């Protein structure tokens, strides 16, 4: 208990490691307000294509006689690397998109649904944690 006061809890230390990534997301997010909707859609498509191409390039570079499980593991590793590479920009685009549609409503299954959310930093920290394959629990008790 005393050590936790000096060094912080494991959770505090883990969150502190994520703060530089959160800062990058928020810095990039700030630049997106000047982009058009079409710019964001185009960039999102480019990011998707990047991930797909990384998978394809890895699959094509592997020997055909390679064990199927090993082959799939290598392709998955390439895909994860691509997702890690685009994560900051993808999360910034999502945050900007949420800001733009905040206050909009849709009719879904006969019910009016109002979008009222732009992700808070703590939610982005949870998303970064989930992206890395770890379990995340919000202070509200909401776990993923």
Residue positions per predicted region:
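N-terminal cationic and glycine-rich segments that engage phosphates or anionic surfaces
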Residues: 3-4
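Transmembrane signal-anchor/signal-peptide helices with a preference for the extracytoplasmic
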Residues: 8-12
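Conserved pre-motif I regulatory segment
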Residues: 14-139
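Conserved glycine(s) of the Walker
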Residues: 143
């Amino acid at each position: 208990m005393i050590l936790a006061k000096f060094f912080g809890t494991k959770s505090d230390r883990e969150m502190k490691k994520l703060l530089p990534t959160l800062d990058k997301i928020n810095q990039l997010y700030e630049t997106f307000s000047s982009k058009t909707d079409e710019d964001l859609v185009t960039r999102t498509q480019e990011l998707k294509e990047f991930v797909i191409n990384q998978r394809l390039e890895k699959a094509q570079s592997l020997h055909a006689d390679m064990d199927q499980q090993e082959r799939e593991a290598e392709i998955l590793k390439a895909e994860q690397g691509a997702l890690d590479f685009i994560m900051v920009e993808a999360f910034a685009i999502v945050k900007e998109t949420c800001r733009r549609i905040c206050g909009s409503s849709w009719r879904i299954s006969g019910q009016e649904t109002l979008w009222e959310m732009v992700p808070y930093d703590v939610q982005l920290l949870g998303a970064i944690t989930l992206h890395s394959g770890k379990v995340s629990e919000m202070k509200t008790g909401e776990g993923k």
